[in-house]
Amino acid sequence: MKIALFSPLNPIKTGISDYNEEMLFELRKHLDIDLFIQRGYEPVNEAVRAEFKIHPYVPETFDPSGYDELLYHMGNNYEAHGYIYEALKEHPGVVVLHDYVLQGFYAERYDANGDFEMYCRLQKKYYGERGESIANNIARPETLPIWESAAAVDYPLNEDVLESAKAVIVHSNFIKEKIQDGFHRPIVKINSHAYALKTFDRNRVRDQMGINKDSLLISSIGYINKNKRFDVILSALDELNNPAITYVIAGKDRGNLLKNYFGKKNLNIIVKGHLDLGDLEALVAASDICINLRYPTMGESSGALLRMMGYGKPVLVTNYGSYADFPDYSVLKIDPDIDEKEYIKRFVTTLIQEEDFCRSVGEEAARFVREECSIEKCALEYASFLKNQANQPPLEISQEAIENDKSR
C-alpha cells in the first residue's frame, strides 16, 4: 500500500516533527511512503533525507491518483500546518488530529492572510453569534483569546478540518469522545508512541548544564504557554523553601511569559530556552522529578510527557483532557482547582521524602509506556487502519506481531 504523508519535519520546530521522524521508520515496514512537506526548506534529519522520497507540496502539480491513501498530520500551528490544511481541503484524506482545538491555527491564518471576513464567516458558520463574538475579540488585545480559556474545548473550530476528513486518528479517549457524536466516519484512537531511550551519564549531564550533582532536580520541558501553569508551579516550589531543589525550565518562551512569574526568593531556577532533542532528553534523564501540567487544554497529547515517563520519572500532570487517560498508578494527577498549588507541594514533598514511592511511580510510568505505547504497536495500528480504509486486508495486531516487528 502506497501513501502520501503530509507532516512538518525538522527544522520546523514542533512536537509533530519529532513524532514523525521516529514513527516514519517503523511505519515504512508496512507501507510505501512518500513525504510531502512545505515548500522552502530542507529537512535536517539526514536519515529521513536518505531513506524517504521527500517532495515539496505544489498544489498545481500534486496528483493523488498515485496513492492508495493520503495521510495528513494536523496540528494547531499555522506556520507548520498551513500547507497541510490547504492540501486537505483540495484532496480529502485520513487526518491525524494532534490537537482538538484549532482556534489558534485559524487566528494565525487570518493574521497571515488578513482576511478577517473569511475568519468571521467560519466562526459564525459553526457557532452563530457566539462565533462572531469570538472572531471580534481577536481584534481586542485586552480580551483573553478563546484558546487560552477553558471554553476552547466547547468551540474548537475543528469542524472545517473534519468535514474534509475521510477518517480520523486521535491519540486520546478525550478527543475521541468529543468528536464521535458529530463525526459519522471512521475514527480510531492510537496512542502516541514511546520514544527510543538513550543512555546518559547523570553527573556529566548536570555538570554540562551547570546543575549541582547533588541537587534535587525538577524539570519541565516544552513550549512555554499560559496553560502550562508555571505561575502556580513556581509559587508552589518557592513556598517549599527547600534549598536542595533546582527547577529547570526548557522550552521556547514565545510570549516572554516567564518574566511575569519570577521574583521568587527561595527557589533556584534555571531557564534553558529551546534545547535540541538530544539535550532535552539528557535533561529529562538527569532529572529526579518532572512536572507537566496543562490547563486549559486544547485537547493535545504530550510527547514531552511520554519522554518523561519513558525515562522512568515520576511526573505531576493535570487530571484533565488526554492526561486523565493515563492510569492513576503511572502519573501523579492534580485537579486544576483551588487546591492545585497545595497538591504540587504535597506530591513533591512526598516524592522527596519517600524514595521507594518515588522509584515505584517512575517504574510504573516506564512500564506503561513500554507496554501500551511501543512504537511497533502504534505503527501496526496505523498501518492496519489505513489498509482497512483502502479496502485492503488489515494487519494482525498481536503481541507476537509486535515482537516480530521489533526484530526487523
Predicted regions and their residues:
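Glycosyltransferase donor-sugar binding loop
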Residues: 40-41, 221, 246-259
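Nucleotide-activated donor-binding/catalytic signature segment of Leloir-type glycosyltransferases, i.e.
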Residues: 258-281
